[in-house]
A protein has these predicted regions:
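HIT superfamily nucleotide-processing domains
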Residues: 1-149
């Protein structure tokens, strides 16, 4: 089975910014899609498609890690809010569970004329991903911030 999340984690696919943070069971990386600079992905290292299928240890690490990732993301761009969204579908098929931790600015909401899920859909529709060099720069800052926890 092809899994983009697994391929990014094991190096079969290019990951701009590289791995940002790792716990015993979870990985944090910059989003490879069009959800904006500073958007982080929090995903279990193992392939799992549903929260109900997380182990007790994976579940125990998740809350504190989402809190940390949100704090890091909030400082990467001038965010007015940080969205935390569970994504686990591609083409209507369950895929590798991952949380999108997205710092959102008032400028983005104005540019796209949307907020919340409508903003994310508008960003996907436009399809403009951040420049790899900017992702590398932001990933370095994120790594340094995770190191303070």
């Amino acid at each position: 089975m092809d899994c983009q999340a697994c391929e990014l984690a094991d190096g079969r696919r290019d990951l701009p910014g590289g791995l940002i943070h790792r716990t015993d069971l979870w990985l944090v990386e910059h989003c490879v899609g069009p959800l904006g600079l500073g958007t982080l992905i929090v995903k279990p290292e193992r392939h799992v498609t549903a929260v109900a299928d997380l182990t007790a240890n994976e579940a125990a690490e998740l809350g504190p890690l989402l809190r940390q990732a949100s704090a890091v993301a909030a400082g990467l761009v001038p965010a007015d809010q940080v969205y935390n969204c569970l994504w686990a579908h591609a083409g209507g098929v369950p895929v590798h569970l991952h949380y999108v931790v997205q710092p959102v600015t008032s400028q983005q909401m104005a540019d796209y004329g949307a907020h919340g899920p409508a903003l994310q859909m508008a960003m996907f529709d436009r399809g403009t991903a951040p420049e790899p060099a900017e992702v590398e720069r932001v990933a370095d800052v994120a790594r340094a911030r995770f190191a303070t926890f």
